[in-house]
């Protein structure tokens, strides 16, 4: 692994263990076994390194979504993708929180944009099957916001896992909201 990749991996480790608030170049340098000038040579600043680490986290997240085998049934595949999203946040709550903060700060992250496109693709497959009850973009907003809400439960209280019934209910209500009952027509 080259020095730049080593620093990004070390930064991810620090964010996962300490959160963005606990991020320090000293901790990253200790893990990567480099000096501060090496870090600044590659990234210019602590924020430059943190941005690179968050970009890598989004790339890892997108890779996990693309690598997972999904059902041929588009509604089942949507549920599986939703579960994958929430599982990532549950397993890596501090990193997920840092990722969301970067997006809220207006960062343009290609893997985040690609992740949204993947969600829209999955919902378009539901529309192609004739089971979408609303516009594809509106449905994507609803599904993403429900997955984000469930994920936030893991971030806000990492020591106390949310009740699985709450998480499942969030998913099912969102999916039911965007899907037309079988045999019905999409509203005009």
Question: Residues of each region from the PLM?
Answer:
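Hydrophobic alpha-helical connector segments
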Residues: 66-94, 139, 143
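Alpha-helical DNA-contacting segments of helix-turn-helix folds
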Residues: 15, 49-57, 99, 108, ...
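Hydrophobic/aromatic-rich alpha-helical bundle segments in the mid-to-C-terminal region
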Residues: 101, 108-109, 113-116, 126-176, ...
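Short alpha-helical functional segments enriched in proximate histidine and acidic residues
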Residues: 14, 64, 88, 122
């Amino acid at each position: 692994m080259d020095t730049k990749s080593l620093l990004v991996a070390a930064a991810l480790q620090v964010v996962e263990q300490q959160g963005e608030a606990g991020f320090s170049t000293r901790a990253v340098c200790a893990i990567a076994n480099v000096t501060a000038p090496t870090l600044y040579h590659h990234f210019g600043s602590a924020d430059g390194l943190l941005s690179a680490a968050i970009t890598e986290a989004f790339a890892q997240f997108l890779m996990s979504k693309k690598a997972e085998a999904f059902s041929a049934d588009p509604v089942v595949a949507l549920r599986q993708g939703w579960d994958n999203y929430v599982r990532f946040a549950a397993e890596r709550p501090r990193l997920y929180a840092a990722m969301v903060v970067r997006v809220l700060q207006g960062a343009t992250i290609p893997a985040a944009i690609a992740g949204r496109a993947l969600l829209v693709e999955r919902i378009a497959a539901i529309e192609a099957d004739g089971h979408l009850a609303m516009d594809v973009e509106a449905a994507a907003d609803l599904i993403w916001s429900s997955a984000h809400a469930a994920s936030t439960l893991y971030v806000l209280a990492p020591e106390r896992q949310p009740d699985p019934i709450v998480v499942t209910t969030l998913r099912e209500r969102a999916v039911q909201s965007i899907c037309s009952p079988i045999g019905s027509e999409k509203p005009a």
